[in-house]
Amino acid sequence: MRTLTHNLGFPRIGAQRELKKALETYWKGQNDVDQLLATARAIRTGNWLLQQKAGIDLIPVGDFSLYDHILDMTTLLGAIPHRFGNTGDKISPDLYFAMARGTADQPAMEMTKWFNTNYHYIVPEFDDTTQFRLASDRLFQEIEDAKALGITAKAVLIGPLTYLYLGKEVTPGFQRLDLLPRLLPVYREILQKIASLGVEWVQIDEPILSLDLEQPWRDSFAEAYHTLHDGSCRLLLTTYFGTVDHHLTLLKNLPVDGLHIDVSSAPEQLESFLTEDFSGKTLSLGCIDGRNIWRADLSQKLETLSQAASRFAGELWIAPSCSLLHCPVDLALETKLEPEIKNWLAFSAQKLEEMTTLGRGLNQGRESVEAILTASDEARRSRTESSRIHNPIVHQRVDNLTERDSQRNHPFATRKHLQQQRFNLPLLPTTTIGSFPQTATIRQARAAFRKNELSHLEYLSAMRAEIREMIRKQEEIGLDVLVHGEPERNDMVEYFGEQLWGYAFTENGWVQSYGSRCVKPPILYGDVYRPEAMTVEWIKYAQSQTGKPVKGMLTGPVTMLMWSFVRDDQPRSTTALQLALAIRDEVADLENAGIGMIQIDEPAFREGLPLRKQDWKSYLDWAVKAFRVASSGVKDETQIHTHMCYSEFHDILPAIAELDADVITIETSRSRMELLDAFVKFSYPNEIGPGVYDIHSPRVPDASEMFELLKKASRYIDPTLLWVNPDCGLKTRNWPETQTALQKMVDCAKTLRSALQA
C-alpha cells in the first residue's frame, strides 16, 4: 500500500512578507481591496505550486488567511458579534478587519495565544442568540482555484468542538457548548459543498484533543462526528501540539476516516495507536517538526516509519506535526547565515522535501534515498560535534547555582516600604510598558548603521536624540515613571540575542504572530553567554535626561526561550537557566549604574505551559526559577517590574506570585478587566498594573472608557498597589494616537487619584 504525503498548512505571509505589506498599505488607504486580494491570490498560488513541485500528494486548501484562520471560521459560519452591526449580507473586508482591529465605535474582538505557540487568534464571541449560517464562499472559491491549477486539494477546516471551545461567552449563565446543535447543520452544509467540488478528503482540525477536556466536551465529539460523517467527504480528524493518547478510546470509536497525530512533540503516543486496532482508519503521522527549524534525523525517522508501516494494517500517511505556519518559508533565502549552522536547519520548503524523502524511502526502499540520508546523518554529526555548541564556563555557572541565587533579600512588604522611600511615587503611578513608536527615521538610522552607512558616533547621536525626545514627550504628558523608548531595538528578543553568544540570526526567517505582525525568531543553537553589557549605556543616558525614574528594559529568560527557535539537544530548563544568568548579569550592571527600576518582561510565560495539567508543575518550577535567578541579585530598594500579555492567568496565579516581581503589568483591556477577578480571589500580594487600553488596535478609546476600566480596577485592587499603564508596548503605533491615548490615561489617573484622596 503506497504511503501518501500531505501537509497541514503553509506560511501565509509570503517569502518576502508580501501579505504584511499589502495589508498595511490597504489599511492606510494606499491600495484597494482588489490589489490586496490579488496579492493574497499570488501567495496562495505560489504556496500550492511549491508544495506540488516538492511532491506532496495532498495539498491543503483553506489554510491561507488574510488575518487569522479562526476569524475566517467565524466569517464562514456567519457568527458575527451583534455589536459590529452585521445585517446578514455577505461579510465585507471592512467588517472582517473591524472585528480584528476595532473601529472608532467598537473595540476589536479579543485576541489570545493559539495554544502554547506565539501565534494569536481572534476569539469568537457567543451568547444565547448566536446563530450560524454559511456566510462566505471564500473556501469554495479557493478550492476551485486550486483545481484549475491541477492541485490535488485537501480542504482544511477548524473542527466544530475546537471552534466553540476557543470562543468565549459574552453573557453570564450561558454555555457555548449549548450552541453545538445550531452549529452542526452549517458544518454539514459546508462539507456537502466541498464534496460537490470533487474534494475527497477534509482535514478537520480538533487540537483541543491535546487538552484535558471536561466530560461534556468529550461526550460531544461523538454527537458531532456522527452528525458530520454523512459520507459526503472523507474526514481526517487532525490533532497536534501534544499527545492525544488519553483520548484513545474516544478516537477509536469516532466515525472518521482518518486520524492525524503529532509524533514529533509526543513520539511516545505512536505505540498506543499501533497497539490499538485502528486498522479501519488512515493514520497520519506528524513526524516532521512543524514548530522548530532543526533538520530532521531522516535515518531515524525512516526507521520508525518502517516499523510503524509493518505493524499498522491500515493506510499510513506522512505529514508535519502541525501546520508549517510556525516556521519561516524558505532556508534558500538565507545568504548570510554561517554555512555550518545553515546546514543544521530546515524551514518550511525544506520540510516538504523531508516529507517526500521519507515517503519515497517507504514506498521505494531506503536505497532510493540513500544519498539524502547520508547528507542528513552528516549534518547531525556536524551539529553534535561542533565547537560552537558548548561553553564550559556557562555549564559551571549553571551547576554552581544555589537556592539563595533565586531569592530576594527580604519579603515584598519590606521592599515596598524601601522603594516608596526611594521613589516617592503618587497613588496610582502612571507608566508605559517600554517601547514607543518606531518611526521611519528610527528604522532608517538603524538600517544605515547596519549597512555601515552611519558611523558608530553618528548612530549614537541619532539614537540619543530620539531618547531625549521620548523623555521630553513623557514629561510633557505627565507620566510618573519613564522609559527610554527602545529606539535602538528592532525586536525584544532579537536585540538581546544579537549580543549573546549561542544565538544566530536570519534575514528572512519571519513567522506570523497575528494579522500583519511578523516576528523573526533568533536561532538559539548553543550555550548562552553574555560577553558584555547590552543596555546599560542607553538607560544611563535616558536617566541623565530626567529627574523622574527611568526603567531599565530587559526581556526575561522564559520569553527569550519561547520566542526563539530553541536547540533540541538539551533540556529547555537548562537553556532557560543559561539565559537567566546572562540577564542576571545585565540586571546587576544596571543597578550598579544607578538604575532603580528594572523591568524584566515575560510576555511568553504562560505560552510555555504544557497543554496537559499533569505536566504543568515541572514547567512552572523551572520557569519560575529562571525568572528568580535573573531578578533576585538586587538590593531591596531596586524595584523589579515584569510584564505579561495575552495570558489567561487564572490557573497559574500561585506561580505568577512566586516570581516575586515588585510590580506586574498585564493585558486586560480587551477582556474588560475580567482577569482582575482572579487576582483578587487569589489575593495577589504585590503591585499590579492592569492595562487600561488596547494598543493592538489603532483605535484611541474615549477617556470615559479608560476611566471606567481604571475605576473598576480600583474596586478590585487596593489602590496603594495599583499602577496605570497601557496593555503593551507602543512600538507598532504612531505618535499622534500614542500621545492622545497616553494623555487621556494620565488625566484619568489624576482624576481618580483626586477622588480617592478626597
Curated annotation (Swiss-Prot):
Q: Please give one Pfam family short name.
A: Meth_synt_2
Q: Which residues bind L-homocysteine?
A: 433-435, 486, 601
**GO BP terms, alphabetized:** methionine biosynthetic process; methylation
Question: Which Gene3D superfamilies does the entry mention?
Answer: 3.20.20.210
Q: Which UniProt keywords apply?
A: Amino-acid biosynthesis, Metal-binding, Methionine biosynthesis, Methyltransferase, Repeat, Transferase, Zinc
Q: Which residues bind 5-methyltetrahydropteroyltri-L-glutamate?
A: 17-20, 113, 517-518, 563, 607
- Record has Metal-binding as a keyword: yes
Disulfide bond in keyword set: no
Q: What is this protein called?
A: 5-methyltetrahydropteroyltriglutamate--homocysteine methyltransferase
What is the annotated role of this protein in its UniProt record?
Catalyzes the transfer of a methyl group from 5-methyltetrahydrofolate to homocysteine resulting in methionine formation.
Recall the GO molecular function terms of this protein's record. Answer: 5-methyltetrahydropteroyltriglutamate-homocysteine S-methyltransferase activity; zinc ion binding
Q: For this protein, what reaction is catalysed?
A: 5-methyltetrahydropteroyltri-L-glutamate + L-homocysteine = tetrahydropteroyltri-L-glutamate + L-methionine
Query: From what organism does this protein derive?
Result: Nitrosomonas europaea (strain ATCC 19718 / CIP 103999 / KCTC 2705 / NBRC 14298)
Instruction: State the needed cofactors, names only.
Output: Zn(2+)
Copy the pathway line from the protein's UniProt record. Answer: Amino-acid biosynthesis; L-methionine biosynthesis via de novo pathway; L-methionine from L-homocysteine (MetE route): step 1/1
Q: How is the cofactor bound?
A: Binds 1 zinc ion per subunit.
EC number(s) stated in the UniProt entry for this protein: 2.1.1.14
Q: Which PANTHER family match?
A: 5-METHYLTETRAHYDROPTEROYLTRIGLUTAMATE--HOMOCYSTEINE METHYLTRANSFERASE
